[in-house]
């Protein structure tokens, strides 16, 4: 077997320094996150049911969402002007910071019938296929567990109405099968889940 020493050395250096870069990005992101706190809460834990929590969201999801707001692919009267001046480095720093924050325990109390029906609905509509088995998100796909109820409800309705864009079209497609009752039950269910 031939081993390319240069590639092995480069891999070792990357393995050692990538965590340091993420830490540096999180430190820079904390400085840049001051304006975000007004809506998204201290350390990214929103207390307003209409605005999403960013804490413990996958970094790639956060940076992708900011990019989509900046480029006009995703629209929001508050977020679009906030994202417009951000550089790619700013977005990555903010993403590193918020993804490193611990999500608060949800305050939302899901209805017992939705707690019972939620896992079956999540399986039926393939939520866990993309969002992960515990709905904690991965890569460019957001954490749903413990997210604000009203926010999730509004996003699911927007995907169904095709007024919200997503990067690969999967959510727009998946939402078409949801009834209004399914949307309410799923939003209520995921809002009560722990992000731990």
Residue spans for each PLM region:
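N-terminal signal peptide c-region/cleavage motif recognized by signal peptidases
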Residues: 19-24
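Sequence/structural segment immediately N-terminal to covalent heme-attachment motifs in c-type
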Residues: 25-43, 106, 110-133, 148
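Bacterial N-terminal signal peptides that target proteins for export
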Residues: 2-12
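C-terminal capping alpha-helices of c-type cytochrome domains
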Residues: 84-106, 150, 176-196
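Gly/Gly-Pro-rich "capping" loops immediately C-terminal to redox-active cysteine motifs
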Residues: 44-74, 80-86, 119, 123, ...
């Amino acid at each position: 077997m031939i081993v390319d020493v240069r590639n092995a050395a480069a891999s070792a250096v990357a393995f050692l320094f990538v965590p340091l870069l993420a830490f540096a990005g999180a430190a820079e992101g904390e400085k840049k996150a001051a304006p975000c706190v007004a809506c998204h809460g201290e350390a990214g834990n929103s207390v307003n049911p209409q605005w999403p929590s960013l804490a413990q969201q996958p970094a790639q999801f956060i940076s992708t969402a900011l990019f989509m707001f900046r480029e006009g692919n995703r629209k929001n009267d508050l977020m679009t002007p906030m994202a417009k001046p951000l550089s790619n480095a700013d977005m990555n720093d903010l993403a590193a910071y918020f993804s490193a924050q611990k999500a608060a325990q949800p305050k939302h109390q899901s209805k017992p019938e939705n707690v019972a029906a939620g896992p079956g609905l999540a399986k039926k509509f393939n939520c866990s296929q993309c969002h992960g088995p515990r709905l904690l998100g991965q890569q460019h796909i957001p954490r749903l567990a413990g997210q604000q109820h009203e926010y999730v409800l509004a996003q699911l309705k927007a995907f169904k109405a095709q007024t919200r864009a997503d990067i690969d079209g999967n959510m727009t497609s998946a939402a078409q099968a949801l009834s209004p009752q399914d949307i309410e039950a799923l939003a209520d269910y995921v809002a009560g889940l722990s992000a731990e």
